[in-house]
From Swiss-Prot:
Acts as a transcriptional activator. Binds to the GCC-box pathogenesis-related promoter element. Involved in the regulation of gene expression by stress factors and by components of stress signal transduction pathways mediated by ethylene, that seems to depend on a protein kinase/phosphatase cascade, and to be influenced by methyl-jasmonate. GO terms for biological process: defense response; ethylene-activated signaling pathway. It comes from Nicotiana tabacum. GO terms for cellular component: nucleus. Expressed in roots. Not expressed in cell culture. GO terms for molecular function: DNA-binding transcription factor activity; transcription cis-regulatory region binding. The AP2/ERF domain binds specifically to the 5'-GCCGCC-3' motif. The affinity of this binding is higher if the seventh amino-acid of this domain is basic. This is Ethylene-responsive transcription factor 5.
Length: 291
């Protein structure tokens, strides 16, 4: 009885001859034939292919197989059916060897699904979109006012030409806004030219008149009060000058003085005679008075 390896080789040769598949030997031949000589695998394949081309097909293997099956008169159809069942019995043993050898030679070592490392689920953070609010800038209309010009640093200067000084410029000041500078120009123009002045805000000329009157009235009233107080002080300080009367010196009693007294009409001259002074060294002489 032939060994299982010999039966397998015969079946493989028959299938190769019938199907004319050159790659069949690399995949379905048992391991001892294909991989016994690992160093000279290419040479063995070439030699097997040349032998198959030179040999003629014979049914000797079929006869051997018929002897084992104890049937001498076996047609080719029964042979293939029996060979198929016989090949299926050996397929379980040969396929794992061929696949294992093929995997080990051609592909890298494969691990089982359980031995694989679990895949990492890395959540990529979403990119935060910054919301930029666009500020709509409303374009403001720049109006040019008469007598106003803007400085490079943003301030507004007001000037006016004085007709009394041959058109020389008069500086009115620097302001934060153009409207304030225009109003300052209107006030100055109204003071210089009156109702003939060309102003930026003609409807506010009446306000300028009221403001000027309010400014002038307190100033005039204050001046009048100052003058009145000065006059009062001057009147108070003026005093009437009174001259002191120096009494006349008492004349000595002489016959002439007595005659003057007696000749008086009132008769009071007698009683107004100065008394005789006891201190006087001379009798009938009054005391001398030093003036």
């Amino acid at each position: 009885m032939a060994s299982p390896q010999e039966n397998c080789t015969t079946l493989d040769l028959i299938r190769q001859h019938l199907l004319d598949d050159n790659v069949f030997m690399e995949h379905y031949c048992p391991q001892p034939i294909l991989y016994s000589q690992s160093s000279s695998s290419s040479e063995s394949l070439n030699s097997i292919a040349s032998e198959l081309n030179n040999e003629t097909f014979s049914f000797e293997p079929t006869l051997k197989y018929a002897d084992t099956a104890q049937s001498s008169n076996l047609d080719i159809s029964s042979f293939f059916n029996n060979s198929k069942t016989e090949f299926d019995s050996f397929e379980f043993e040969t396929k794992p060897n061929v696949s294992a050898a093929r995997i080990s030679s051609n592909s890298p070592k494969q691990t089982s699904f359980k031995e694989r490392k679990p895949s990492l689920n890395i959540a990529i953070p979403m990119k935060q979109q910054e919301v930029v609010q666009k500020v709509e800038v409303v374009p403001t209309e720049k109006k040019h006012y008469r007598g106003v010009r803007q400085r490079p640093w943003g301030k507004f200067a007001a000037e006016i030409r004085d007709p009394n000084r041959k058109g020389t410029r008069v500086w009115l000041g620097t302001f934060d806004t153009a409207i304030e500078a225009a109003k300052a120009y209107d006030r100055a123009a109204f003071k210089l030219r009156g109702s003939k002045a060309i102003v930026n805000f003609p409807l506010e000329v009446a306000n300028f008149k009221q403001q000027d009157n309010e400014i002038l009235q307190p100033a005039n009233s204050g001046r009048k009060r100052m003058r009145e107080t000065e006059n009062e002080e001057i009147v108070i300080k003026k005093e009437v000058k009174r001259e002191e009367r120096v009494p006349a010196a008492a004349a000595p009693l002489t016959p002439s003085s007595w005659s003057a007294i007696w000749e008086g009409e009132d008769g009071k001259g007698i009683f107004e005679v100065p008394p005789l002074s006891p201190l006087s060294p001379h009798m009938a002489y009054s005391q001398l008075v030093m003036i």
